[in-house]
């Protein structure tokens, strides 16, 4: 089967990551973690942070596609992932989110974005995520109770997709 490397051109504004989608079956085969508050003195206890953290893009990970050109795989290099993460923020798309790539969502914002530089010392490892160096990680704040209660808490969505 054909394998295609996707490359981004920083000069083309219409190319790049337009939104982060929360999905049931992420093509990158990596689920997110739903973070909740731990007990903190002098604060209300058991309030949920409503933050999802997970991989947005994994370098060199074959992603299956079936389209007009038939079946094939795509992948992103580490360099392309760095460009994609930077362009996403530079273009102010932190609040662009969808459900399963179909329905626009309000109240979801990318509040943290980083590239994994060390598997052992990265924040993702603290949460039990095993991702390779070069992975684009993100934390999304969910300020939408309907999305949180209907999709996140019920495990209808398990990861991110771009």
Residue ranges and their predicted role:
Residues 1-162:
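Signature of dsDNA virion morphogenesis modules
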């Amino acid at each position: 089967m054909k394998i295609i490397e996707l490359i981004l051109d920083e000069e083309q504004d219409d190319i790049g990551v337009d939104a982060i989608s929360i999905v049931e079956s992420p093509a990158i085969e990596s689920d997110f973690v739903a973070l909740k508050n731990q007990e903190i003195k002098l604060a209300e206890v058991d309030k949920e942070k409503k933050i999802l953290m997970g991989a947005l893009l994994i370098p060199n990970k074959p992603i299956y596609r079936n389209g007009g050109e038939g079946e094939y795989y795509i992948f992103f290099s580490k360099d392309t992932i760095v460009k994609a993460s930077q362009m996403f923020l530079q273009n102010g798309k932190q609040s662009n989110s969808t459900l399963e790539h179909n329905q626009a969502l309000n109240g979801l914002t990318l509040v943290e974005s980083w590239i994994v530089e060390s598997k052992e010392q990265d924040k993702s490892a603290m949460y039990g995520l095993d991702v390779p160096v070069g992975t684009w990680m993100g934390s999304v704040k969910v300020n939408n109770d309907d999305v949180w209660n209907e999709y996140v808490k019920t495990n209808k969505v398990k990861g991110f997709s771009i």
